[in-house]
């Protein structure tokens, strides 16, 4: 008789890194295929996007979106703004994300999730582990100078990779 030992859950820290971050999708798929249970995810920037979509059950949709990106489609998401702390408003991307994540709240996910962002006024690291999933993700990837900062829970936040590129703490 073979005794099965209890499965150990792992915690994942998914880092930033722009386009390289899409590789997190493959990592999550490989862990699932090998039966490795993910107990929680912390993500920064694109790592927050991929991790949040995974826990929300939207990884297939995110992968389809990533695979469909062409230069023309990417340009279509650019919403240039004058003033406000970034070249891009980021609202077209944010709207697309909200369409797929609807009103999902972080605390309603079946496992803990934390998105890491940076408070622009202090430079401090901020862990977002409650509230709107799409807002938390948007704040975590709002690269200063490119995207406008995001108001979240009374704070003005930008990309978490500025203070914690891979949130292992």
Which role does the model predict for each range below?
Residues 1-44, 52-169:
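Patatin-like phospholipase
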């Amino acid at each position: 008789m073979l005794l099965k030992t209890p499965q150990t859950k792992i915690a994942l820290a998914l880092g930033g890194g722009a386009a390289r971050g899409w590789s997190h999708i493959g990592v999550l798929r490989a862990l699932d295929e090998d039966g490795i249970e993910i107990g929680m995810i912390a993500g920064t920037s694109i790592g927050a996007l991929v991790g949040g979509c995974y826990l929300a059950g939207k990884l297939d949709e995110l992968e389809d979106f990533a695979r469909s990106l062409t230069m023309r489609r990417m340009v279509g998401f650019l919403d240039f703004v004058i003033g406000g702390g970034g070249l891009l408003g980021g609202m077209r991307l944010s709207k697309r994300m909200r369409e797929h994540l609807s009103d999902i709240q972080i605390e309603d996910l079946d496992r803990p999730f934390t998105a890491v962002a940076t408070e622009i006024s202090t430079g401090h690291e901020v862990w977002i582990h409650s509230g709107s999933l799409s807002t938390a993700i948007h704040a975590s990837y709002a690269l200063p100078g490119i995207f406008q900062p995001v108001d979240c829970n009374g704070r003005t936040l930008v990309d978490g990779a500025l203070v914690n590129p891979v949130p292992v703490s």
